[in-house]
């Protein structure tokens, strides 16, 4: 199995100011939806926004499929929040237990988006929300990850989620 270390931003990596701004904006945006809610971040990677979300949410759990990446997050966060290894399509949470599920820059790694949506539907409480940030495949400078399964455009995501009775909103 791929550990995604070669495509994950790690502490000490060179990153552009644009990358930092995009990451910050995603989590500040998510913070509004997570305020005093039970939240899980799926595919959390090294956890760049978990500290902020921890201060916003009533409860926060996070996980990733890559144990080496989770170990990096565990070194930083220690016992401040539960970090678990899990597959986004088989989450270790009880039915109707979360208000918000976050998946940032990882939906394209999922081999089956329908299984992911089924799992979100199981885990989310009624009126729960899924927050997604993803690459825009329609931009000229788009650079796909070598491990991706499928990049979705806005129209595709809208159709997929609305066919499953989710209301959708998109921000550019």
PLM feature spans:
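A short beta-strand submotif of the Rossmann-like class I SAM-dependent methyltransferase core
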Residues: 100-106
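A short glycine-rich, Lys/Arg-flanked "PGG" loop and its adjoining helix->strand segment in the class I
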Residues: 114-126
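Conserved S-adenosyl-L-methionine
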Residues: 166-172
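Conserved N-terminal segment of class I S-adenosyl-L-methionine
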Residues: 1-90, 117
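Conserved beta-strand signature within the Rossmann-like core of class I S-adenosyl-L-methionine
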Residues: 128-134
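Short N-terminal helix/helix-N-cap motif within the alpha/beta-hydrolase-1
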Residues: 111-115, 142
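Acceptor-substrate binding/catalytic loop of class I
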Residues: 141-160
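A short acidic, Gly/Pro-enriched loop at the edge of an enzyme's catalytic core
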Residues: 89-100
């Amino acid at each position: 199995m791929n550990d995604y270390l070669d495509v994950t931003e790690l502490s000490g990596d060179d990153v552009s100011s644009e990358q930092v701004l995009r990451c910050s904006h995603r989590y500040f945006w998510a913070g509004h939806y997570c305020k005093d809610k039970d939240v899980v971040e799926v595919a959390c990677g090294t956890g760049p926004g978990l500290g902020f979300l921890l201060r916003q949410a009533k409860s926060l759990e996070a996980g990733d499929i890559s144990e080496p990446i989770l170990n990096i997050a565990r070194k930083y966060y220690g016992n401040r929040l539960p970090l678990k290894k899990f597959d986004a399509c088989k989450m270790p949470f009880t039915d109707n237990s979360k208000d918000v599920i976050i998946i940032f820059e990882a939906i394209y790694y999922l081999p089956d988006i329908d299984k992911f949506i089924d799992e979100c539907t199981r885990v989310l409480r009624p009126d729960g929300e899924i927050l997604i940030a993803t690459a825009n495949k329609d931009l000229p400078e788009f650079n796909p990850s070598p491990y991706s399964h499928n990049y979705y455009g806005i129209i595709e995501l809208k159709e997929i989620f609305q066919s499953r009775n989710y209301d959708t909103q998109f921000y550019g």
